[in-house]
């Protein structure tokens, strides 16, 4: 998600260091101490303006959430929502999702969310896709054994690519939705991103999958 530079975004993040972690590498292996409890930790890589992560945190106080984005202005809007909702189980990081192993110890994370990631449609940009094998290797490293990835997109090409990429990596596809909002059972519990709200109202099909890493043989 690309947004215009927001005046004062940097100062806003700095003034809310209790939510936005200034030096996240300092907490590698000790994120439970940062949260003050030993609840499961879920991360969203590319959090956008924060509707999903704050919505999930409000619904699941028994889970700790970390919102990750590399765009300063975007993260500042997510911070707005976290402050307004006064959620003790949300932290935020202004970092590149490709470097997650610098900030989390092996097996420290319970679940990864990838929502409406940049599809990078050109073949020469394949390695930038968040479901490319190098990213999957990073997720596997920081996730607990049999940890899961939950992925949503409106881009059919990226979804098809991701299905193949995850399968080739050896992951188990637990569930696949080819039209998420038509699932009467799941739709009521689906927490949407801002992007999803906008485009689903226009009739755009939303794809979703849940996959888990399997023990190495």
UniProtKB/Swiss-Prot annotation:
GO terms for molecular function: tRNA (guanine(46)-N7)-methyltransferase activity. Substrate binds at residues 122, 154, 193-196. Residues 124-129 are annotated as: Interaction with RNA. One of its GO terms (cellular component) is tRNA methyltransferase complex. It comes from the Bacteria. Pathway: tRNA modification; N(7)-methylguanine-tRNA biosynthesis. Its EC number is 2.1.1.33. SUPFAM superfamilies: S-adenosyl-L-methionine-dependent methyltransferases. Belongs to the class I-like SAM-binding methyltransferase superfamily. TrmB family. This is tRNA (guanine-N(7)-)-methyltransferase. The keyword S-adenosyl-L-methionine applies. It catalyses: guanosine(46) in tRNA + S-adenosyl-L-methionine = N(7)-methylguanosine(46) in tRNA + S-adenosyl-L-homocysteine. S-adenosyl-L-methionine binds at residues 44, 69, 96, 118. InterPro entries: SAM-dependent_MTases_sf, tRNA_(Gua-N-7)_MeTrfase_Trmb, tRNA_methyltr_TrmB_bact. Keywords: Methyltransferase, S-adenosyl-L-methionine, Transferase, tRNA processing. Catalyzes the formation of N(7)-methylguanine at position 46 (m7G46) in tRNA. Pfam families: Methyltransf_4. The active site is at 118. Gene3D superfamilies: Vaccinia Virus protein VP39 (3.40.50.150). It is an enzyme of class 2 (transferase).
């Amino acid at each position: 998600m690309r947004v215009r530079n927001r005046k004062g975004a940097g100062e806003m993040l700095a003034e809310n260091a209790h939510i936005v972690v200034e030096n996240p590498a300092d907490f590698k292996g000790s994120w439970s101490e940062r949260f003050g409890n030993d609840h499961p930790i879920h991360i969203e890589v590319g959090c956008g303006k924060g509707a999903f992560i704050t919505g999930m945190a409000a619904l699941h106080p028994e889970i700790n959430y970390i919102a990750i984005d590399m765009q300063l202005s975007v993260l500042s809007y997510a911070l707005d929502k976290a402050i307004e909702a006064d959620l003790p189980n949300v932290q935020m990081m202004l970092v590149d999702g490709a470097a997650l192993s610098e900030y989390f110890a092996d097996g420290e994370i319970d679940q990864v969310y990838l929502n409406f990631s940049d599809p990078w449609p050109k073949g020469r940009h394949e390695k930038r896709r968040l479901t490319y094998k190098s990213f999957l290797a990073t997720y596997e490293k920081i996730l607990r054994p049999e940890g899961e990835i939950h992925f949503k997109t409106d881009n059919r090409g990226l979804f098809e690519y991701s299905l193949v990429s995850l399968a080739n990596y050896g992951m188990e596809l637990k569930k696949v939705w080819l039209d998420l909002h038509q699932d009467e059972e799941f739709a009521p519990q689906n927490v949407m991103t801002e992007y999803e709200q906008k485009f689903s109202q226009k009739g755009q099909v939303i794809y979703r999958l849940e996959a888990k890493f399997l023990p190495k043989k």
